[in-house]
Amino acid sequence: EINPLIVTRDGRVVALDCKFVMDDSGIVRHPDVARAGTPEKLTGLEARAKAAGLKYIDLEGNVGVLANGAGLTMTTMDVIRHHGGRPANFLEIGGESYTQARPALELLLSNSRINSLVINFCGAFARTDVMTQGVIEAIEALKPKLPIFFSVHGTGDEEAIKLLKDRLGVAPLATMDDAIKAAVGAAA
């Protein structure tokens, strides 16, 4: 929006004021605009996530969410609400982002509102065993005290399930719905 726009006596057109919205995915091509951004709109956790390159939105619930892909993450949040729970966040990792499992888990563990965590992986192109390996390494390093419930389906899920059993002594629940119900129950 440009308002006002004036024409000077010598014929030049000058925008005296303007407002614009830049898409988050395009701002990386404009570092000067990114530096002048509005970090005051981000929560502390959101600012930390952004600095770490994570896709995170802080919410007011008590069930932590870690999933692969925006669609699955939003579905997980919807099912949490369906079962009477409240998601504490939106946080997705996947594909090459599995290397961010540790900063993602550190971020979730620093959220004092989270009473339980659901980790929901569904692989088509992304391999669930690779994503699960990253999460297992983060869990082994950070040793979280809160209950964690897994749902793992798709490409590499047999290997992922074996990794969870062998390394953490846990098995994912049979369905996404079962894992989410358990997480909602544990958070109550």
Region spans (language model):
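ATP-dependent carboxylate/acyl-activation modules
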Residues: 1-2, 6-119, 129-133, 137-140, ...
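Short glycine-rich, flexible loops that bind phosphorylated cofactors or substrates
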Residues: 126
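Proline-centered loop/turn at the N-terminus of a beta-strand
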Residues: 145-147, 171
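Short glycine-centered, acidic/aromatic-flanked micro-motifs in structured strand/loop junctions
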Residues: 121-123
